[in-house]
């Protein structure tokens, strides 16, 4: 369900039959100068079904062509929120961008969620990755490749999707 909050709002639609997300449009024009973020209203409030969440994303065309993105990267609209859905748009480019009234400014999808109960434990189960953080899975792949090749190698040099060893 959705509620139209002002006369400039547009009911969302999917751009194509294969679109995963629906477009949200601005209700008013606004200029966003370089390295500035401004809130852009959609004029819509949603009743997201219980057990679901609405995720709001930047439109790829804005990022690729205009240097625009959502200031919070991904908006999370909970099922109990009933206010206007807005997008805070950040301009990463060197030129002022003029958002026009009726312009597609973001895209959103409504997806099911899993609510979990947290259980505090003394130890977590072990995995091959363990506590390895950023970049650790790439190192694991290199180690597997070398183990499968056998022999002694002095240097690993990743290039694209290939790994060279001597």
Residue ranges: model-predicted function:
Residues 1-152, 159-166:
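DUTPase catalytic domain/fold
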């Amino acid at each position: 369900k959705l509620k139209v909050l002002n006369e400039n709002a547009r009911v969302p639609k999917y751009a194509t039959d294969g679109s995963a997300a629906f477009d949200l449009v601005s209700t008013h024009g606004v200029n966003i100068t370089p390295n500035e973020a401004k809130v852009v209203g959609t004029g819509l409030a949603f009743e997201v079904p219980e057990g679901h969440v609405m995720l709001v994303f930047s439109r790829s065309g804005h990022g690729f062509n205009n240097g625009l993105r959502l200031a919070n990267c991904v908006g999370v609209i909970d099922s109990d929120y009933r206010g206007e859905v807005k997008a805070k748009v950040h301009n990463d480019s060197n030129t002022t961008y003029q958002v026009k009234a009726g312009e597609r400014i973001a895209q959103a999808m409504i997806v099911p969620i899993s609510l979990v109960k947290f259980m505090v434990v003394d130890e977590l189960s072990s995995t091959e990755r363990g506590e390895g953080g950023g970049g650790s899975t790439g190192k694991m792949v290199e180690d597997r490749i070398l183990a499968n090749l056998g022999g002694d190698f002095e240097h690993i040099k990743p290039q694209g999707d290939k790994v060279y060893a001597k």
